[in-house]
Amino acid sequence: GKSMASLFPTLKSLPKTQVEKIFYLSAKTAGQASAEDALAQIHAQQLPIRSLTITAKRKACFNPEQPCDPNYCDYAKGYFDRLPQALEIIRDQPGHWDKARLETLAQVHQVCPFELSLDAAREVDVIVCDYNYLFSPSTRLKRFFEERRGRYSVLLDELHNLVDRGQDMFSAEVQKLQ
């Protein structure tokens, strides 16, 4: 429905607008699932579009009890040595890279699935992710939004949720130590 109504014309306009990448931002997993469903329908038409969903680090990590550090995590150790082969597969295979597909690829290449999703974001046409990846100062995708490297379209799902999310992101809380 609504996801397709925004994604399809935006994708169709890519060759004419010089837009390099589409960001589909949602506050909720359900909104991301809706975008993934719309992308599945688009991919079923054999269009050579690459897309991915960035899953939160806490949900994607293979070793959540370990620090994200090459000294503690085997998926971080040697990450950049194994990354090129994984990215080559993403470049060579149009379609949607969801959490499960990225995890499978990450396991095969023994790389961190979360970091792989961030690096793979440069290789795809559409990125489905949480609002935080654009608006939160601590999790913003700096490689896209602070380096000012390209022209992007941003589609915001359920925009009315952004107000509450923004208040949470930019509010401070002081707690008394006991």
Tell where the protein language model's regions lie, with residue ranges:
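Hydrophobic residues on the short alpha-helix immediately C-terminal to a glycine-rich phosphate/catalytic loop
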Residues: 9-13, 38
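Walker A/P-loop
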Residues: 1-8
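A substrate-engagement module of RecA-like helicase motors
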Residues: 17-127, 132-135
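Signature of the SF2 helicase/ATPase Hel1-core->accessory helical subdomain module
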Residues: 6, 33, 37, 109-126, ...
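Amphipathic alpha-helical interaction segments
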Residues: 14-17, 166
